[in-house]
Design a protein with these regions (language model features):
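Residue-level detector of conserved, function-critical positions
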Residues: 1-99
C-alpha cells in the first residue's frame, strides 16, 4: 500500500473483490473487500465479511469493519447501524448510537 503524490485512490474490482488504484493504475490497496466506495473526507467506506468500516488512503483500517451498514462521511460524521441501532461515527471511530 502506497500513497502516490497524495492522489485519491479509486475503487476497482478483480476476481469479485474490491481494492483501490491510483490515477495511473497502480494498485494502492489490494483487492480483499466485498464492496468499496469512493473516498469522502479522506476515508472510504468498505465491506469485509458482511460488515462495514473505513480505510484511509494507505489502506489502513482506521474504523473497524463491524457495522451492519455505513454511509460516506459528511461534515466529519458518517451514519452507521450497529446491532440494529442507528447512530454516527467520527473519523476517530467514536460512535454514538440511538438508545
Amino acid at each position: 500500500m502506497k500513497d502516490v503524490l497524495g492522489a485519491t485512490p479509486v475503487p476497482y474490482m478483480k476476481n469479485g473483490k474490491f481494492g483501490y488504484k491510483d490515477k495511473v493504475g497502480n494498485v494502492v490497496v489490494e483487492c480483499k473487500y466485498d464492496a468499496a466506495y469512493k473516498f469522502s473526507e479522506g476515508l472510504a467506506c468498505v465491506r469485509l465479511n458482511g460488515k462495514w468500516g473505513f480505510i484511509d488512503k494507505l489502506g489502513r483500517e482506521v474504523i473497524k469493519c463491524k457495522y451492519d451498514t455505513a454511509n460516506d462521511f459528511s461534515g466529519g460524521l458518517a451514519r452507521v447501524v450497529f446491532n440494529g441501532k442507528h447512530g454516527v461515527v467520527d473519523k476517530f471511530g467514536n460512535c454514538t448510537l440511538d438508545k
